[in-house]
């Protein structure tokens, strides 16, 4: 056993005791003692007091309170050894107690081991006896868990797929109301029907088929109940009431999932609304309106004597009713966004057999369906409107009123096209009525033309050669038509909406209301034998017509150019007439006819290329020979000059008076001015030819005079008894210019 004191301390005490000579009888010799002492001293001296063991020993001594005396030093070893022995004895006693306790523990452990062995034997026996019971209990527990799982599955299946009898009664019984519970149950049954498809994916499809068949029957019964309930509600539905029941809107959204029932319901609704609106239209036409309108509001039939107002009132009522009907149907069918469209689309997808083409993708257009429903609601109103409009138009013979009605119908056709679509029944009806009205308008125009053609008195031109009265009346009607068209469509050239090509929609009116009358008026000019009167008469007709349509671009676009072309041709004719009048009245025509061979057109030869090879080139006439022409003989030329002098003072007034019956003064003035200018050019030509002839004769006379001077002596004896020949030679010596002294400048001044 280890010591309670450090080993160094004990050894130090032993060494101290051994230093005494009498410490032991077995002490070694002195030499050995001396060596041992020396070694001891050396050891003591070499010991380091910084050693931890020495420090601990010193600390222990310090704690024991030992004083450094000789007695203490002598007894220290013994005391320490005694303490060591006592400590060891105490330890031995303690270990003895521990040994006894260990023996008792060993006995207990042996007893426990024996008991455990016995228990093991009992456990083995018990295990052998309980193993079948435990196995059976485990099997029963597994069966219990399986039964509980099946029970949970059955409860969940029953809760999800089986509808109770009470719920089925709410869903299918006609006595039960259509409320929130009905729609919730219907949604649940639809979900069950959809989930049955999962059951059909298993090996045993019997349960899925039975449940699907049962849910289908329940759904059909529910939809039939909903269909009948909606029909019942439609009978008492008031679309004018802004508070339309939300339940009927929801019912319509749900019923939309069955397109066949939904369309049948819409058919019933359309028939009911058609009856209601037809009755309301008849009431507005014939019965006095009471209530808010008061006595000032009268039936539409009161204005039947005025076709435009009568038809306008009917169209206004139809338009107002259409707008109200569309707004009411929008609140009924489209108030909740696209829910109805989604339901109908789902129904179309669920009924693929309803498609005409298997590959066709059916899509639902809500706005188009709404417009179609409004059209169907107004079927009776449209039929009554058509009958009344046609009767009014057929019984009226004023073309202006007919055209105003046609424009009114065109306006409402555009309005209904925007409201219900371009292919809606109302738009087609108004287009048909518009065409009917225009055909009646054209018929009235043809009848007027036929009547005028048979009235010979009306076809005789007036004395002042103005446009015939029937044409002026037709132009007055045309003016009213153009004003109506301008008020309806504007002054620009309008086109039909349905055509991409630019088509003037007023052109048919012009062809019916202007062209026949204009052609008839032009044909009456054949009654005038005088070409001048005939030209003036035709000019007045075209001028009057052009002035009427010139202010309207849509009329000028098609007819102004032909009228201007005809006027240009007539202007040329009048110019030729005026020119010929000036030439004949002044006598200048005789001189021009005589000078025809000397004109540039004659000297250049014929212009007809077909005769170029057949005619020989004529020799250039001698200008000096003009004096030998009959028209330029002194007497004739003096007479022509005198006639010209008599004509010039009043020439312009006479020429202007010649066209005084042309009803456009500026037109007549311009024609006269051009005719005067042409006359001046002709006179200038004659003047030039006369001067040229005199100059040519002067050259010939100089040559002849020289020859005469050489023969003067021999000629002096000739007979001079013929006085007439001498006078004639004297007059020829004066020259043509002196016989015809007028100049072009004087002519222009006198005719300006």
Swiss-Prot record:
Membrane topology note: Peripheral membrane protein
Name any GO cellular component annotation: Golgi membrane
Which SMART domains does its entry note?
COG6
Keyword Signal in record: no
Low complexity compositional bias, start-end? 9-25
List where in the cell it is found: Golgi apparatus membrane
GO BP terms in the entry = intra-Golgi vesicle-mediated transport; protein transport
Region described as Disordered: spans on this chain: 1-36, 601-620, 702-736
Pfam families per the record? Answer: COG6_C, COG6_N
Instruction: Report the InterPro entries cross-referenced here.
Output: COG6, COG6_C, COG6_N
| Main subcellular localisation | Golgi
Q: Where is the composition biased (Polar residues)?
A: 601-619
The family annotation for this protein states: Belongs to the COG6 family.
Function, as annotated? Acts as a component of the peripheral membrane COG complex that is involved in intra-Golgi protein trafficking. COG is located at the cis-Golgi, and regulates tethering of retrograde intra-Golgi vesicles and possibly a number of other membrane trafficking events.
Can you say what this protein is called? Conserved oligomeric Golgi complex subunit 6
